[in-house]
A protein has these predicted regions:
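Active-site donor-nucleotide binding/catalytic segment of nucleotide-sugar enzymes
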Residues: 163-175
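Active-site loop-to-helix "anion-binding N-cap" substructures in soluble metabolic enzymes
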Residues: 3, 7-141, 146-158, 175, ...
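Conserved small/polar residues in nucleotide/adenosyl-binding loops
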Residues: 261-270
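Active-site rim loops that border cofactor/substrate pockets in soluble metabolic enzymes
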Residues: 188-218, 226, 233-242, 246-250
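Short glycine-centered, acidic/aromatic-flanked micro-motifs in structured strand/loop junctions
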Residues: 12, 42, 169-171, 225-226, ...
Length: 271
């Protein structure tokens, strides 16, 4: 491979979505407004470099409000959203809080609440323990929403007390995998109520489509992102399914396998 000309294809669109950019800006403006430190509950977005940069600017990241020693300081909720209980707890602590939840995630929250009020039992299609899933499930009373993660769970799902059902989804899922799960639910429960609009974020969809378009042309595919980022992990899966089995998630240049570090680009193209 030493003498082979190397062509680099850049996926387009790429980079942060509007919700991530908005959340980062909220933290930076809060630091300017309130001074330091500013607390952030959970990583504001799942990106190591962003988190480290904000730490250097004066943000302190915690997982729970109880960890905040000085509760006179403001706290920011991450882009993934939080259970309804968290803002209530912040009020009980007399804390100033700023909600950086992505507007598209907030839309799913409102949708779930409205369906619950209309008498529907909710199914949430998503990944267990992901902050967004925890936040969405935390909008509703316990027992009124169930999580389905894969096709097998969809095939085995049972309706309790013959309730009418509806579904919402995590915003950062694989478009194709989610479509298959939804189809199983629709086949099994013809009267299941669908969301008015698809819940998967348009930026997630666009980036997955972009990866599909170029992965089949590639011998090697790098997704640059963090391992706890649902979007980044899904893009690797999409690249592999689209024809590039040699697809790797890295968060920095240092993670490029040694066997590839001698390669030099002959041409770089936006695709």
């Amino acid at each position: 491979m030493k003498n082979k000309e190397l062509k680099i294809l850049l996926s387009a669109p790429r980079g942060f979505c509007a919700g991530v950019e908005r959340a980062i800006e909220i933290v930076e403006k809060s630091i300017q407004k309130y001074g330091t430190p500013v607390y952030v509950r959970h990583e504001i977005v799942h990106n190591k470099y962003v988190v480290d940069d904000l730490k250097n600017k004066g943000a302190i990241f915690v997982e729970e409000l109880e960890e905040i020693e000085d509760k006179t300081r403001p706290v920011i909720f991450s882009a993934h959203g939080v259970p309804k209980k968290i803002p209530e707890d912040a009020k009980n602590y007399n804390m100033t809080y700023v909600d950086a939840t992505c507007p598209l995630v907030s839309k799913v929250h409102r949708e779930a609440e409205n369906l619950n009020k209309a008498g529907y039992h909710l199914i949430l299609i998503g990944h267990q323990n992901h902050p967004e899933v925890i936040g969405t499930m935390g909008q509703l009373p316990k027992g009124s929403i169930d999580l389905i993660q894969n096709e097998d769970e969809a095939k085995n799902y049972k309706i309790q007390n013959n309730k009418k059902i509806s579904y919402v989804t995590q915003t950062t899922l694989s478009v194709d995998d989610t479509k298959d799960i939804i189809q199983i639910l629709k086949d099994r429960f013809p009267n299941i109520k669908e969301p008015l609009k698809e819940d998967i974020c348009y930026a997630t969809t666009n980036r997955q489509m972009a990866v599909k378009n170029i992965a089949k042309k590639c011998d090697l595919f790098f997704v640059i992102g963090s391992r706890n980022s649902s979007n980044s992990v899904r893009l690797v899966e999409v690249a592999k399914k689209s024809g590039c089995s040699n697809s790797i998630l890295i968060h920095s240049q240092s993670e490029i396998p040694v066997s590839y570090t001698h390669l030099r680009a002959h041409e770089t193209l936006d695709n």
